[in-house]
Amino acid sequence: MMSEPEALSLSAQAALGAVQAPQRSQFSLLVRHFLERFFNHETASPDGDAKSRLILIAVATGIPGFMVALYLFPVYHPFIGWPPGRPLNADPPPYWLQVNHHFFFVLYSFVALGIITVFEWDLFFPDLLDVFVLTTLPIQDRRLFLARVAAIGIFIVGFLLDANLLAPLVIPASFDPPNLTRLLTGHLLAVLAAGLFSAAFILALQGVLLSALGEALFRRISLLLQGLSITVLVMVLLLFPVLSGAVPAFLQSGSRIVFYCPPFWFLGIYQRVLEGPAALPIYSRLAQTGCVALAVTIAIAMLSYPIAYLRRVRQLVVGPGTHDTRSWVARPAHGLLHATLLRDPVRRAVFHFISQTLLRVQRYRIYLVLYGGVGLSVVVASVLRLSVEQGQVRVEISADGVRAAIAIVAFWTIAGLRMAFVSPGNRQGSWAFGIVHGRPPQLDTAMHLLQAAKHWVLLCSGLVMLAAMTALWVFAPPELRGWRAAACMLLIAGGLCLLLTDFFFINVKTVAFTGEPAREQPNLALTVLKYFTFFPIVIWIPVASEHWVQAGIRHFLIALGAIAAAHLALEMLHRRIIQEHCNMPGLEDDEDDFPMKLGLRY
């Protein structure tokens, strides 16, 4: 039986001397510093506690591939009752179904590494902290540059392995291939190459544009590029169930589409290694294209990065030029708002405070871009349908997809705005509201402060919804182009914007951008579960109600009355919540409320 280590007395511990920290070189310390910046920055975690959150994300990155490989076991090994209609002694799944299974793993690696690289977009190049702090230290510029390059490489390779090394643990048992060595070799080569190409392409794109356009012009299009990248990546993944039905037609016909879609290149590597010389000729061509594209992309990233690095440092030293943020186009709109929604001075001040903060702080715009990219990709995946007829792939527009797109646009627009508004880390303006109105303020003042944010969200979501409906109307099927259908869709869209704004902001008790960091780490799994539970319900509403509302004017008026009643009920509930908040004793900036609440929630 092993004995526990003997406890040393204080004198014995003192005799051991101080604990010696490991000796690390300057280069090693710099690499660790840059990696720490990747895991702790204001975009990922405004409260400065991103390490635990990103560790959860890193673990979750490998779960989808692992779970899909696990769920494929009964497909290749049928048992009683599953899959339905297949006997126990059935042959392996059809060839093209197996190809689609391989294609998913390639596609997932491509999308996962692309999203991670886009999310860390701004951290790959120096910022003001690096220029005005690190460059003043006795550190060679070359060593500083190489340390950042090494940190980028470690970051990308780490996530590349994390996203793809769990699935191979299950694949041999799930697929039960005739040649295990070929399967694992082809799988690892294809998924690693796909992920590496995606990350290298994003880095090369950023390096080339920054080198060619300079920092000032690149900053103007940076958010647009991030949004488009997120949209394309998420859309490709969401379209996989639709795209999988067209994969055989694309590959058998030798369509040129597959040569313009990078995931197909690495599917070619997968199938060529797995099948050997017996593989279809198109796989060899796709594999060659993938290998050449990967080498060229990495070379471009390596050549453009030093130039972009130098241009970024030079621009940071020189400083950005000033520009006028006033908009002459917005003046008439502001006058109309001041005469209608923003008559109260407090509400008007908070409304413009929100507008100016969004223009000034890039972090909040990044949140909106990420949410907008995800929402747009879900809209496209919902609207598009691919069908194969006589070996030809046809693209169709789904009427139910157009109806669901209304709810998708409203949900992701308002959810993104709420995420930005309640995000902590930019509380410089909170002191002014506390001094002028008190902390907490009077009920009427508090309602004016909070209603301004809801008006801003409602106005923004309404404009986005109007633009989305106009674009959808152009491509909508004939059944959705009549005036009755348009009126019903406008009613449902307006009602969703109004009620979702009420629902998302019902527990918001602080002025936008002035909230405090949460004292407890939020449960990421519970947050995701809330979205997965609430989001399908929101999508179901326009799909299920549009035909009923369109049936007659009586149904239209009933729907209008139901929306108004729900809005009034949510407004009353919100006012009651704010009244309870205003009745609480005021706290100083860093004072804890534990002695008064004993940590209880109510």
How should these model regions be labeled?
Residues 139-143, 322-330, 438-439:
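Membrane-cytosol interface motif
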Residues 24, 41, 127, 137, ...:
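Intracellular alpha-helical coupling/juxtamembrane segments of multi-pass membrane proteins
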Residues 1-114, 159-417, 462-602:
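Transmembrane alpha-helical segments and their membrane-interface loop/helix boundaries
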